[in-house]
């Protein structure tokens, strides 16, 4: 089972919230106190909630479900991309396009366009075009890759969202809520936990904290997938023995 511990969270600075004047009262029950006008998050509360979220993700991955990793702000984007790719999950690291979930039909058409352009770039079609046309298509390809590259292999709506900074990704959460897609989210002291099914109270800015969340989630996914593969192997091995007994 995927687990994080208190020491890891303290080292990563998960407990440092935002300045006290920016607090959201809805996060009050997760705040331990304040130090130098900075709210301190109660990690005794965070620990079980974080681990519950990891268990949920591991279970989803074991069932071959897709978890969409979402983190488009500068401090999160690169890590989101790396960790999602490492565990084979879709991601949005650049900008959330309105309708990415609620208007998936249109998004699917854009993904098809992206795939077509990728093929053209590889099969020599670009070389046969005028310089201007080739440049325009290259720019199109770059733009689409930046916006949709992380979800081009998603193959349909995700089964859950994992979000870094729920304020920054509020549109994504609203869309998931409309469609009944569960949301796992890191919620800092200045944010609202509304619309988040699995709340992880914690610092959503510090690079080390963001790294910890994403690394732990990726590990949970990998463990879930490995567990599913192992049990599938065991099932195959045991099946003939059972039928032989019958």
From Swiss-Prot:
Task: Please give the SUPFAM superfamilies that the UniProt record associates with this protein.
Answer: Ribosomal protein S2 (SSF52313)
**A Pfam family assignment:** Ribosomal_S2
Concerning CDD domains, the annotation shows: RPS2
| Signal peptide, first to last residue | none
**The organism's place on the tree of life at top rank:** Bacteria
Q: Name one GO molecular function term.
A: structural constituent of ribosome
Look up the record and give one Gene Ontology term from the biological process aspect.
Answer: translation
Q: Disulfide connectivity?
A: none
A single GO cellular-component term from the record reads: cytosolic small ribosomal subunit
Q: Which keywords has UniProt assigned to this entry?
A: Ribonucleoprotein, Ribosomal protein
- Family the UniProt entry places it in: Belongs to the universal ribosomal protein uS2 family.
The identity of this protein, by name, is Small ribosomal subunit protein uS2
């Amino acid at each position: 089972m995927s687990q994080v511990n208190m020491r890891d969270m303290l080292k990563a600075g998960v407990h440092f919230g935002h300045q006290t004047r920016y607090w959201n009262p809805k996060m009050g029950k997760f705040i331990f106190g304040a130090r130098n006008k900075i709210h301190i998050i109660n990690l005794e509360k965070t620990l079980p909630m974080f681990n519950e979220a990891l268990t949920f993700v591991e279970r989803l991955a074991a069932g071959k479900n897709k978890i969409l990793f979402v983190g488009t702000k500068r401090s999160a984007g690169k890590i989101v991309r790396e960790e999602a790719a490492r565990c084979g999950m879709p991601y949005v690291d650049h900008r959330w396009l309105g309708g990415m979930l609620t208007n998936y039909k249109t998004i699917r058409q854009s993904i098809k366009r992206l795939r077509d352009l990728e093929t053209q770039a590889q099969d020599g079609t670009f070389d046969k075009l005028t310089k201007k046309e080739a440049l325009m298509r290259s720019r199109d390809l770059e733009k689409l890759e930046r916006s949709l590259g992380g979800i081009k292999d998603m193959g349909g709506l995700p089964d859950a969202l994992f979000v870094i900074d729920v304020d920054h990704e509020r549109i994504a959460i609203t869309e998931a809520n409309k469609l009944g897609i569960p949301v796992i989210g890191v919620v800092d002291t200045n944010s609202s936990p509304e619309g988040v099914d699995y709340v992880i109270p914690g610092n959503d800015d510090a690079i080390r904290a963001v790294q910890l969340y994403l690394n732990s989630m990726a590990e949970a996914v990998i463990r879930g997938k490995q567990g599913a593969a192992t049990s599938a192997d065991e099932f195959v091995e045991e099946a003939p023995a059972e039928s032989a007994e019958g």
